[in-house]
Curated annotation (Swiss-Prot):
Catalytic activity: L-seryl-[protein] + ATP = O-phospho-L-seryl-[protein] + ADP + H(+); L-threonyl-[protein] + ATP = O-phospho-L-threonyl-[protein] + ADP + H(+)
Organism: Homo sapiens
GO biological processes: MAPK cascade
Name of the protein this chain belongs to: Mitogen-activated protein kinase kinase kinase 19
This protein's encoding gene: MAP3K19
Record-stated family: Belongs to the protein kinase superfamily. STE Ser/Thr protein kinase family. STE20 subfamily.
Result for mutant: I500M: In a breast pleomorphic lobular carcinoma sample; somatic mutation
Compositional bias per record (Basic and acidic residues), positions renumbered to this chain: 1-19, 344-361, 524-542
Domain of life: Eukaryota
GO molecular function, one term: MAP kinase kinase kinase activity
EC number: 2.7.11.1
Signal peptide: none
Residue ranges of the region described as Disordered: 1-28, 44-74, 344-380, 524-561
Residue span, Protein kinase domain: 1061-1324
Length: 1328
């Protein structure tokens, strides 16, 4: 016979395998009282991860720790296998009464035969007896009574094991390790239930059941749905278990029926469940499911017990009332192990148990039930699927009569098995009950067939269980999930509520018939199918519903996969790597499918395209996937732009059968009219579009797009027919670029943008939002962004995005409406943006400005989440307007907000689809509104085309007022754009930000040559070296920061003088690059950190690039006197350059090398500044992770600067120091300065920087870090050792200094002080 896979010993499982592998079959078959009948759910382990829908009832052994408590397991409805485990009692053997011994001998003899007949393999002391399926000879009477079929997933069969009530004098049952001596008096095992069977068999020996007569016990809590996972241990805490005791006594006649034929009516197991089967009513479910019966049923239980008890007492001589049932019920509470139930409760329970049975039921039902049970049990032996009839009357057994009192009773019996106070003149001792209880416990423990490890904690201490797994013989069936067993429990007169089962598992093939006690559904496939579908639904839900309001696009190659490709702002800070061929971004299969999409144009109005013709931009081109929008259909029909055609907006100039179509855009009344009609709907959509939370997500695949998205998608689908490749978009968009980007870029539009986020708590003036819609006309949609510089504001924004409703979004020339109070339709970004410029002057609301050329690029059907310049519109709090200037060939926006008082750079990213397209970079400079008075600086052109700007801008404004664009205007814009591009070819521009010495902001921007092809221009960032330097245009306004107020210098706006910077000597080499000294043509010294990207390995280059992005992200957000200032970034060929403030003094290590160890007074001052900088980092959830002498720089004025944030990381959130949530699991840093937790990889938190500070102070004091005499690896092992003691400072240093270092080098990071605490240390007081 095939055996069930033997349960593994789980840390939290009571299913300890039987200890005696040598025990004879007789021993095995004679069940110790700890032996457990396990109702095992055979469902697949994968199904367990659904919602823990299976509630497995398991009874805990007496020995079990009360803490093993119960954990409610939701009843598994899938497939239930009843496995009977026969754990051996580990408790020391105790003497058996002569009477008991005799009974056992009888039982053993009978059981011996049975055991021999069914020789059971006892491999690891797991007895898996396959019970073949046989029809029950009799249907339990109680089950017949049951009218409302109930699905008892977890039937505690433990109660099925009969115990003789005659064993009154037996001290607590002891299951002894050596089963072979089972027959001996001293070692009487909890096989008392077997004994009871024999006793009962005395009345009807013919019904001998296997030691584990699989007596269906009512003690099965139906699903307790509220707890999908392991129930909280709160249920263990049952304050007044005593109140439940009376219920325990309610032994349901059902037990009689349920009890094996050997078991007398008295042996009826108390049903642990309320007749109504209400999971809420407190039905004690075996083990973890134990819900305590409610006291309202107390009297009924008592009465039933009294009746049953009296009857039992009468029959006790011949038929020992198996307190086994009591025991079982007790056992079920044993799971709870509440130590607060007095032993008297045990006695009460015993009495109740005997009383509960009604005499008449006892006789009639007992016999029939025994017969049924015996036959069933025997059948079980052969029938894997017949669970066992558990005809238990829920008659008044309200919620398992076994209450905590029994549980405690068991414990009390353990503690004082002799503390028997006979209740109701019962000669029964709680010891007997105890034994029975233990038997029940062991018997009723539930083994989870699939994941044994998932057993409740209570199971951990279970005695070894010989698992007679019913189904394992038909292992294929079991593996396929034996469908759940439906057990109906007829209740006498009491209404039954349908069993509550998890809805996900609700679909069952078999339904319980009133006339059938057990329904075994068909195979598991259906359930599994359900589970799979359910899981897929869950997956799709969880992954597709990430921060996306209603509609969102999931990037997938084939079927919609809920894989989201996120690229944080950090990852997009830098321009796309030049080494990356933009072509791969367009997957070939997408190109092939584009023609097909054209065929589907007619259907796009009603359905979304299955595949997007243009892949959304994912950070890694190699993993780029097409975007499959999962969008919710608009709640109400909208005209939007679905009714617009290309003929409404574009005039096809040139097209070929195979090539892309080239269109010229022009304003038409219908187009403008549509824009007007949708202006009122913008507010609704504003709430749908959300700014990236915490990070600029270049998540092209996941944009929060609203209903507009679906509409736009259809519009875009029409457009896709003309776009066979990414390049085609350029032709389409040329006019857009001319109209908008050039208008802005050539004019460097300095319009006032009011960016007050007063109510929003956002300090940064400009906001970037993923374009929520499909960027309809972005000419460079496919162009991968070249983000050269990004100012600290961006990182600030990562945490400070305003309410979505307040953001007005400028979609990338998409056919969507942008969101604004007086919003602009994204479809006419051109018109709307121009119009916004006008509104800007009126200060009604901040205008979203055309962010970058790339947003005007290829109309990607997906909004590639281009970060369009999002000017937050806050009409209520419009107190200031910052001028916004967009410079042509820059993809980045620099914004100086009054809140941050510093120049901030924004880089906008776009797809890089064509090889020649390195995106333009735009700079938006926010100026004080004061300088913008009288509209004098509405538009300013930078570049050599300043002349004529006024007239063109005036035309633009006029056209905006008329809300229509004329051919003349378009022509002017196009001519201006071309002229500007020609003049600015091969130019490298730099934005120099002059501030006070502490806040020198110098940002270098590179503009690339812009070759033209097919009337379209694509940009390549090329840094042209002139001799030893690079030409840089000073395109930035000079900001004088005084009194924390920025003063705009209008003269600087007109500065066109090129700035060169020359590379100088190497200042140092860090973990991620080499730092050079640079001199600009303005005479400023800067530090330039250059990192060469590996062109041969694209993946490695991307990884390195992301590291640099993260470093820059951090640097831009950090503004502190003790942290080096960030000036900008540049991508030159395959080298990334980061421009930083130059610290001429050098590092502390170099100072030590030059001057030797520092005096205490000196390093005390330095230490204080280091701590101040670190405290600032930690306050902003950043850990430096590489603090050492080489990374601490000294200004000539004595100011300390922390540098090299290549290892720095931002913590998940601002948690308590040392908490697991903000621990980083990677090892970075230098071994001599590494904290023990870093070396041990137990998590890197803020406190790890404190350790490094201690080592740095030690280094400043002695000239070398601690353990410098050791080899690097030896030092690592020493520091990582738990007992390794760090050396103290030499004796000649003050006690305060030594104590400071000692505190920093505290091995336990939880005891290590924080930076703020150390700043209050007495050692630093002298630094004042």
């Amino acid at each position: 016979m095939s055996s069930m896979p033997k349960p593994e010993r789980h840390a939290e499982s009571l299913l300890d395998i039987c200890h005696d592998t040598n025990s004879s079959p007789t021993d095995l078959m004679t069940v110790t009282k700890n032996q457990n009948i396990i109702l095992q759910s055979i469902s697949r382990s994968e199904e367990f991860d659904q919602d823990g829908d299976c509630s497995h009832s398991t009874l805990v052994n007496e020995e079990e720790d009360p803490s093993g408590g119960r954990q409610d397991w939701q009843p598994r409805t899938e497939g239930v296998e009843i496995t009977v485990t026969f754990p051996r009692d580990v408790s020391p053997p105790q003497e058996m009464s002569q009477e008991d011994l005799k009974e056992k001998n009888l039982i053993n003899s009978s059981l011996q035969e049975w055991a021999q007949a069914h020789a059971v393999s006892h491999p690891n002391e797991i007895e898996t007896v396959e019970l073949r399926k046989k029809k029950l000879t009799m249907r339990p009477l109680v089950l017949q009574k049951e009218e409302s079929s109930r699905e008892l997933c977890n039937v505690n069969l433990g109660f099925l094991l009969p115990r003789s009530c005659l064993e009154l004098n037996i001290s607590k049952s002891v299951t002894r390790e050596d089963a072979p001596h089972f027959l001996k008096e001293q070692q009487r095992k909890s096989e008392e239930f077997s004994t009871s069977h024999m006793k009962y068999s005395g009345r009807s020996i013919k019904f001998l059941l296997p030691p584990l007569s699989l007596l269906p016990t009512r003690s099965g809590v139906l699903t307790i749905p509220q707890n999908h996972k392991f129930p909280k241990e709160k249920e263990r805490n049952i304050p007044s278990l005593t109140s439940f005791v009376p219920k325990l006594s309610v032994s349901v006649r059902q037990s009689d029926e349920l009890s094996p034929s050997n078991e007398p009516p008295g042996a009826l197991v108390k049903s642990l469940m309320d007749p109504t089967l209400r999971s809420s009513d407190g039905f004690i479910w075996s083990r973890n499911m134990c819900s305590f019966p409610k006291t309202n049923h107390h009297r009924q239980c008592l009465e039933k017990e009294e009746n049953w008890k009296s009857k039992e007492i009468e029959e006790c001589n011949k038929i020992e009332i198996t307190h086994f049932e009591k025991g079982q019920s007790l056992v079920s509470f044993e799971n709870l192990k509440e130590g607060n139930i007095p032993a008297v409760r045990e006695e009460d329970i015993d009495c109740h148990g005997s009383k509960t049975r009604k005499p008449e039921e006892e006789n009639s039902q007992y016999l029939s039930s025994r017969k049924n049970e015996s036959s069933v049990a025997k059948n079980y032996e052969q029938d894997p699927e017949i669970v066992c009839t558990i005809p238990s009357k829920f008659q008044e057994t309200q919620h398992s009569e076994i209450t905590p009192s029994q549980d405690e009773e068991m414990r009390n019996n353990k503690a004082a098995s002799k503390r028997v106070s006979l209740h109701k003149n019962e000669a029964m001792e709680p010891n007997n009950i105890l034994e029975e209880c233990t038997v029940l416990k062991s018997l009723s423990s539930v083994v989870f067939d699939d994941p044994i490890d998932k057993l409740p904690e209570g199971c951990s201490s279970m005695e070894t269980n010989i698992k007679i797994s019913i189904a394992e013989r038909a292992k294929p069936e079991m593996s396929r999930m034996v469908p759940l067993i439906h057990i109906t429990f007829p209740v006498d007169g009491s209404p039954k509520e349908p069993v509550i089962a998890k809805p996900s598992l609700q679909t069952r093939k078999g339904t319980i018939h009133n006339n059938h006690s057990v329904n075994i559904p068909v195979h598991q496939e259906n359930d599994k199918h359900k589970m799979n579908s359910h899981r897929s639904k869950l997956d799709s839900k969880t992954k597709t519903s990430k921060k996306t309001p209603q509609n969102f696009v999931i990037s997938t190659e084939g079927p919609i996969k809920p894989t989201m490709h996120k690229t944080s702002i950090k990852t997009q800070i830098f321009p796309a790597l030049g080494l990356v061929d933009p072509r791969p971004w367009q997957l070939p299969r997408f190109q092939k499918k584009m023609p097909q999409i054209a065929k589907k144009q007619s259907t796009h109005r009603t359905q979304k395209p299955k595949k997007q013709s243009f892949p959304c931009i994912c950070k890694n081109p190699g993993t780029q996937k097409s975007c499959v929008p999962l969008s919710v259909q608009p709640t109400e029909p909208r005209l939007n732009y679905l009714d617009l055609k290309y003929s409404d907006m574009f005039k096809e100039i040139n097209s070929t059968a195979n090539g892309p179509g080239i269109y010229e855009m022009f304003g038409t009344p219908v187009y403008c009219h549509v824009r007007e009609t949708e202006r009122d709907e913008n507010t609704y959509y504003r709430e749908i579009c959300s700014a990236p939370s915490g990070r600029r997500i270049t998540n092209k695949c996941r944009s929060s797009h609203s209903e507009r998205k679906s509409n736009i998608r259809t519009r875009l689908s029409q457009k896709k027919t003309h776009m066979k490749c990414p390049k085609t978009s350029f032709g389409i968009k040329q006019e857009h670029k001319v109209l908008i980007s050039k208008e802005k870029s050539s004019k460097a539009v300095h319009s006032n943008l009011h960016d007050i986020e007063n109510g929003d708590g956002i300090s940064e003036p400009d906001w970037q939002i993923k374009s929520s819609g499909n960027e309809f006309l972005s000419s460079k949609d496919e162009i991968h962004p070249m983000n050269l510089a990004q100012t600290p504001e961006q990182s600030m924004k990562q945490n400070e995005f305003p309410p979505v409703s307040d953001l007005s979004i400028v979609e990338e020339v998409s056919m969507e409406e942008s969101t604004g109070d007086r919003d602009i339709s994204n479809n006419q970004i051109l018109t709307t943006s121009l119009r916004d410029l006008q509104e800007l002057e009126e200060l009604h609301h901040q205008i979203p400005f055309i962010p970058s050329e790339d947003s005007w690029a290829v109309p990607s059907e997906k909004n590639s989440n281009k970060y369009v310049q999002q000017e937050k519109q806050n009409t209520a709090s419009l107190s200031k307007v910052n001028a916004s200037r967009i410079l042509t060939n820059d993809l980045e926006f620099d914004s100086v907000s009054d809140h941050s008082k510093t120049l901030t750079n924004f880089s906008f990213q776009a797809k890089q689809e064509s090889a020649s397209s390195q995106t333009y970079q735009y700079w938006v400079h926010y100026l004080d509104h004061d300088s913008l008075a009288n509209k004098s600086i509405t538009y300013q052109m930078f570049g050599k085309t300043l002349s004529g700007t006024n007239s063109i801008s005036q035309e633009i404004m006029d056209s905006v007022n008329n809300e229509e664009l004329t051919d003349e205007l378009l022509g002017c814009l196009a001519a201006e754009l071309l002229a500007l591009d020609e003049k600015d070819n091969n130019s490298c521009q730099k934005m120099a930000n002059e501030t006070d010495p502490e806040n020198l902001n110098l940002v270098l921007r590179w503009r690339g040559s812009t070759p033209k092809e097919m009337g379209r221009e694509t940009t390549k960032v090329k840094i042209q070296r002139h001799s030893s330097g690079l030409r840089i245009y000073d395109r930035e306004e000079k900001f004088l920061i005084s009194n924390e107020k920025k003063i705009f210098s209008e003269n600087s706006l007109k500065s066109e003088e090129p700035i060169l910077w020359t590379k100088g000597e190497i200042l140092g080499k860090g973990a991620y690059g080499t730092v050079y000294c640079g001199l600009t043509s303005q005479g400023q010294l800067i530090a330039v950190k250059q990192v060469a990207l590996d062109t041969s390995n694209k993946l490695a280059a991307e990884k390195e690039y992301r590291k640099l992005q993260e470093e820059v992200d951090l640097l831009k957000a950090l503004k502190h006197v003790n942290i080096v200032a960030y000036l900008g970034t540049c991508l030159q060929e395959n080298t990334v350059s980061i421009f930083m403030e130059f610290v001429p003094g050098g590092s502390i290590s170099s100072i030590i090398n030059r001057f030797g160890p520092l005096p205490e007074m000196v390093f005390c001052k330095y230490t204080k500044q280091i701590l101040q900088g670190v405290a600032y980092l930690h306050e902003n959830c950043v850990v430096h992770r590489d603090i050492k002498g080489n990374n601490v720089m000294l200004m000539p004025t004595g100011i300390i600067k922390l540098i090299d944030f290549g290892c720095a990381r931002r913590l998940a959130w601002a948690g308590l120091n040392g908490t697991h949530s903000d621990m980083l699991k990677s090892m970075h840093g230098t071994p001599y300065w590494m904290a023990p937790e870093v070396i041990n990889e137990s998590g890197y938190g803020r406190k790890s920087d404190i350790w490094s500070i201690g080592c740095t102070v030690f280094e400043m004091a002695t000239g070398k870090p601690p353990l410098a005499s050791m080899d690097r690896m030896a030092a690592m092992f020493y520091i990582g050792a738990h007992r390794g003691l760090m050396p103290p400072l030499p004796d000649h240093f003050s006690e305060n200094a030594a104590d400071f270092v000692r505190m920093c080098l505290t091995r336990d990071q939880h005891e290590r002080p924080s930076a703020l605490q150390l700043l209050k240390h007495s050692f630093l007081e002298r630094s004042h």
